[in-house]
């Protein structure tokens, strides 16, 4: 499986950070939000950010922007679609419904949630849709934090999960770990434990 284009839905701190990190690796990204104005402002924040999110300001050309109503067709060509919207299950479920109706067959769909169990995120998906669905929990700031948690579900195509892990390690420079669906995933659990020690 090759990842040659990515769509990110949600252009807040995490969506923007993931977009910047992908474009640093020369992966074309489309950043979608409720309005093109919101995603355009996010692209401008990426360009001006301190510390810099981009390794080279010219990399910004790898990021296109749009909105989830007029520009959603880009999902049909994407190899990986990342959901990075607000942590509300009802909103995430609506986004997934729209993604799975429009994505190309076999495209990976992932959530950047930091705490919602994958069982809840995927409860309304078909078994076939679950094969291509996982959590990709990037840490903020994405460019500077090496850890990436990939949380799998019981229906995943494990070869696809392994391909995604290798892409994130080799192309994005992440220390990717594959986790089971446990509360808070691994990174948050270790963080809470460390604060208590």
What is the role of each PLM region?
Residues 1-49, 102:
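NAD(P)+-binding Rossmann beta1-loop-alpha1 motif at the extreme N-terminus of oxidoreductases
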Residues 22, 43-54, 82, 100-103, ...:
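Structural signal for hydrophobic packing residues in well-ordered secondary-structure cores
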Residues 80, 85-148:
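Rossmann-like NAD(P)(H) cofactor-binding subdomain of soluble oxidoreductases
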Residues 9, 17, 32, 66, ...:
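Structural motif
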Residues 19-24, 58-80, 163-173, 179-184:
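Amphipathic alpha-helical segments at domain termini/boundaries
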Residues 2-5, 60, 78, 106:
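Phosphate-coordination loops involved in phosphoryl transfer and adenosine-cofactor binding
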Residues 27, 102, 127-129, 147-182, ...:
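Internal alpha-helical scaffold of NAD(P)-dependent oxidoreductase catalytic cores
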Residues 28-78, 88-90, 94:
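Conserved N-terminal Rossmann-fold NAD(P) cofactor-binding segment
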């Amino acid at each position: 499986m090759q990842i040659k284009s990515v769509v990110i839905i949600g252009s807040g701190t995490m969506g923007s950070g993931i977009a910047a990190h992908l474009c640093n690796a020369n992966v074309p990204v489309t950043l979608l939000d409720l309005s093109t104005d919101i995603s355009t402002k996010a692209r401008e924040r990426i360009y001006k950010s301190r510390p810099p999110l981009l390794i080279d300001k010219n990399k910004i050309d790898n990021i296109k922007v749009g909105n989830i109503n007029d520009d959603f067709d880009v999902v049909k060509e994407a190899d990986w679609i990342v959901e990075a919207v607000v942590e509300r299950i009802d909103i995430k479920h609506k986004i997934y419904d729209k993604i799975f109706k429009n994505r190309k067959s076999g495209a990976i769909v992932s959530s950047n949630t930091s705490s919602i169990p994958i069982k809840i995120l995927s409860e309304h998906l078909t078994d076939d849709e679950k094969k291509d669905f996982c959590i990709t929990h990037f840490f903020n700031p994405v460019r500077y934090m090496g850890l990436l948690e990939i949380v799998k579900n019981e229906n995943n195509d494990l070869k696809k999960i392994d391909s995604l892990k290798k892409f994130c390690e080799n192309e994005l420079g992440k220390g990717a770990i594959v986790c089971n669906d446990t509360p808070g995933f691994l990174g948050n659990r270790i963080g809470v434990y460390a604060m208590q020690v």
